[in-house]
């Protein structure tokens, strides 16, 4: 059931900006449902709904109810969402009737969704496991014979696909054909920006997307592309501002907090970075990436003791990840706790022996512990792996 019930809480309402508490409640509820705790998610959303009658809260609660097998309750919530914001629950209703095996009713609601602001991409629909129960039906095949997507939508989707699999040249070919038949409208500029971003031309992307945003300042997809381009152009201050626009506009994506935190740590805004990571960890307390980033921010700020706490917590949660050992080893290395560093580098190398930096740092730790022969052994392994930084250590300590 958990595999079939892919979370698709439908967060954005046309013309609606959610308050930050609503955003947090939805993110937390989604995390609980993903973790297989639908009862806790429903309890949280019940309380949230008493404070704010948002369609997104009802669609999220419907997903938690589906995971519990409460299809009737989920249908009621999707219908309630539709009353608050037209068509916001249609895709969810389509999914739930597909799960029930009712192809006709499922496709009725899917058609309503396709004609609305909530229209999903073809790829997203076809990959949605909820429709696996009806995708072999004649009604399903007939449905997809209709032209649901414009040439612009199809071209952009194809460009995104080729970029996602690393075939940038093919994405350029699609863009070229697209431009032959259409004027230089916003879709063309956006599509070209995707190709330019994938090609490393971030300065052109920033110029073009800024132009698009001047006429449509709140467009989520434009803001996301701009933030990526700013990051690629080594402009973390600009990227953090763009991510702030996305967050304050009510976009429901916990990952935005980590992206902004990474920008803040690059600009030296440690408190802001840790605040964003803290928000993310409230939602996903066991997340390896967030705990790692928190530790690295603390290292950069000079609080190595706090960094060790984050890295140790990460290791407790993810004991088979070599990078978690590497993170803590590097922290011990900075504090000159050589024996502890050696132990963690060794554990990391047991899991990932091809890490030349781990061999180098373990060798340095051994050298500082007075174990020159063992250190030289590690230096030679690192050198054979192509690590040029080890050369001085070899020449000074291991060549007699």
How would you name each of these model-derived features?
Residues 47-48, 80-81, 113, 178, ...:
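Canonical positions in the second alpha-helix
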Residues 33, 66, 98, 163, ...:
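Position-specific recognition of the canonical hydrophobic site in helix A of tetratricopeptide repeat
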Residues 125-161, 368, 372-400:
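Terminal, low-structured helical/coil segments at or just beyond the last alpha-helical repeat
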Residues 50-51, 82-84, 116, 181, ...:
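Structural marker of alpha-solenoid helical repeat scaffolds
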């Amino acid at each position: 059931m958990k595999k079939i019930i892919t979370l698709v809480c439908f967060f954005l309402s046309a013309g609606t900006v959610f308050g930050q508490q609503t955003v947090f409640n939805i993110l937390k509820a989604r995390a609980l449902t993903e973790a297989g705790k639908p009862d806790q998610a429903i309890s949280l959303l019940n309380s949230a709904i008493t404070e704010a009658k948002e369609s997104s809260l009802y669609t999220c609660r419907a997903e938690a109810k589906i995971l519990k097998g409460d299809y009737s309750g989920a249908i009621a919530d999707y219908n309630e969402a539709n009353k608050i914001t037209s068509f916001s629950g249609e895709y969810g209703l389509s999914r739930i009737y597909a799960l029930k095996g009712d192809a006709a009713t499922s496709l009725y609601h899917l058609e309503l969704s396709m004609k609305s602001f909530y229209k999903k991409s073809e790829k997203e629909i076809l990959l949605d496991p909820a429709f696996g129960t009806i995708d072999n039906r004649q009604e399903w095949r007939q449905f997809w014979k209709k032209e649901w997507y414009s040439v612009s939508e199809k071209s952009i989707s194809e460009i995104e696909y080729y970029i996602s699999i690393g075939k940038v040249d093919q994405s350029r070919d699609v863009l070229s054909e697209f431009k032959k038949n259409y004027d230089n409208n916003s879709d063309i500029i956006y599509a070209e920006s995707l190709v330019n971003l994938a090609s490393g031309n971030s300065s052109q992307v920033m110029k073009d997307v800024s132009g698009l945003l001047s006429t449509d300042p709140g467009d989520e997809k434009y803001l996301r592309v701009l933030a990526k381009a700013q990051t690629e152009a080594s402009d973390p201050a600009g990227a953090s501002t763009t991510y702030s626009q996305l967050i304050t506009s009510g976009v429901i994506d916990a990952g935005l907090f980590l992206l902004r935190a990474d920008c803040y740590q690059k600009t030296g805004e440690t408190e802001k970075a840790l605040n964003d990571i803290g928000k993310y960890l409230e939602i996903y307390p066991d997340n390896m990436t967030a705990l790692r980033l928190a530790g690295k921010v603390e290292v950069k700020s000079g609080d190595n003791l706090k960094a060790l706490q984050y890295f140790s917590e990460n290791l407790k949660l993810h004991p088979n990840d070599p990078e978690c050992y590497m993170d803590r080893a590097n922290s011990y290395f900075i504090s000159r706790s050589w024996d502890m560093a050696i132990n963690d580098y060794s554990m990391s190398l047991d899991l990932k022996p091809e890490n030349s930096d781990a061999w180098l740092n373990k060798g340095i730790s051994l050298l500082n512990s007075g174990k020159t022969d063992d250190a030289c052994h590690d230096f030679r392994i690192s050198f054979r792996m192509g690590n040029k930084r080890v050369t001085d250590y070899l020449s000074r300590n291991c060549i007699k």
